[in-house]
Amino acid sequence: MFLNSLDLPGQPDNSRIVVAMSGGVDSSVVAGLLKKEGYDVIGITLQLYDHGAATHRVGACCAGQDIEDARRVAETLGIPHYVLDYEKRFREAVIDPFAESYAHGETPVPCVACNQTVKFADLLATARELGADALATGHYIRSRPHGAHRALFRPFDVERDQSYFLFATTQEQIDYLRFPLGDLPKAHVREIATEMGFVVADKHDSQDICFVPQGKYSDVITKLRPEAVNPGVIVHIDGQVLGKHSGIVNYTVGQRRGIGVATGEALYVVYLDVENARVIVGPREMLETHKLFLRDVNWLGDERLDNFPSDGLEMAVKVRSTRPSHLARLHYQEGVFSVDFLECENSVAPGQACVFYDGNGDGARILGGGFVTHSQRAVGVEMMLRRVLCNPETKAAVSSEFKTTASK
């Protein structure tokens, strides 16, 4: 049976493809390439949030100008283009959980939630309703046949690798999705956009979380969860109270800059004690992480969970999109996934994604991932943390801070 360039049966003109058009250069080129090949292309753009101050902000995605840019590209290509209002859904599925997670001292990854819900669930359902044979996006990741299904692999352009944000994609979704840019370098994508005469050819890439102006997470939390912005104290892991802070939402594990205390020692945020509004700080070595426990794991590997190797599986894992992967061993016992690092890793916070790969090399397969619930460090560090967390004197300092604030 003849398969076209998207591994669909028949000639391109027999396949209808919905393209998720964000208004950026990548998704525009996807629409252009597929249209050029002869596919029946339909463009869809999602309005995700109240544009506000972000409407004309350089480096934001999903802003108001993006919708207009997507419309103009679709017009250039002569394809149908629809704008769907997903603002309410986006707030419920992405923004509110992000704020809730941050208020609880976690470091969430909202782009994963957006792909997991709005883009690859809701939009995919819309594509099916339109009779599309596949949904194509401008993500830099590869999709290939693997046995009876398809699997995800790191892209050719490793500098643009977006696999970290796509680990939660289900097998059913992977089988329906297509990623035409997986084998292309970004520079070539821009060249194609120029050749096709797109107004977005020189447009800046999106960099910030779309609903977080200037990357200030605390501003969003303060607006959506004002009750979570409580003052407290900054405590050294040795138990010494170093100063005060105006809210834990201003901190994340591993942070060094902007802590708000000066001691002559390089200090990092080691732990966030949300219940007692304490920011625990210490030297960098206190951040070294040995083990992680995960929740909401999406397993895409070939091994059946009911027959998972008792000694685990060796693989590469990433805990931040911008960091290299590290060798680790994944375990699954009694419904719980855990990761033992075989190479040093640090600054891992609850809420972060931990993504699995079958190796460190280019083109490695994505085996799934999950979200960090908690981590384990060296025994000595864990003992110091427990000691300071149970210290009644620093708790008293927090209580005194609350009373002082209330009396003003």
Swiss-Prot record:
Region entry Interaction with tRNA, spans: 160-162
InterPro entries reported in the protein's UniProt record: MnmA-like, MnmA-like_C, MnmA-like_central, MnmA-like_central_sf, Rossmann-like_a/b/a_fold
Pfam families: tRNA_Me_trans, tRNA_Me_trans_C, tRNA_Me_trans_M
Enzyme Commission (EC) number: 2.8.1.13
Any single Gene Ontology cellular-component annotation: cytoplasm
Record-level GO BP terms: tRNA wobble position uridine thiolation
Keyword annotations: ATP-binding, Cytoplasm, Disulfide bond, Nucleotide-binding, RNA-binding, Transferase, tRNA processing, tRNA-binding
Swiss-Prot/TrEMBL site (Interaction with tRNA) positions: H139, Q352
Domain of life: Bacteria
Active site residues of this protein: C114 (nucleophile), C210 (cysteine persulfide intermediate)
Disulfides per UniProt: C114-C210
Reaction catalyzed: S-sulfanyl-L-cysteinyl-[protein] + uridine(34) in tRNA + AH2 + ATP = 2-thiouridine(34) in tRNA + L-cysteinyl-[protein] + A + AMP + diphosphate + H(+)
The protein's enzyme class: transferase
Subcellular location: Cytoplasm
Annotated ATP binding sites: A20, M21, S22, G23, G24, V25, D26, S27, L46, G138
Record-level Gene Ontology MF annotations: ATP binding; tRNA binding; tRNA-uridine 2-sulfurtransferase activity
Entry's family note: Belongs to the MnmA/TRMU family.
Function as written in the Swiss-Prot or TrEMBL entry: Catalyzes the 2-thiolation of uridine at the wobble position (U34) of tRNA, leading to the formation of s(2)U34.
Protein name from the UniProt record: tRNA-specific 2-thiouridylase MnmA
Organism expressing this protein natively: Bartonella quintana (strain Toulouse)
Lineage, broadest ranks: Bacteria, Pseudomonadati, Pseudomonadota, Alphaproteobacteria, Hyphomicrobiales
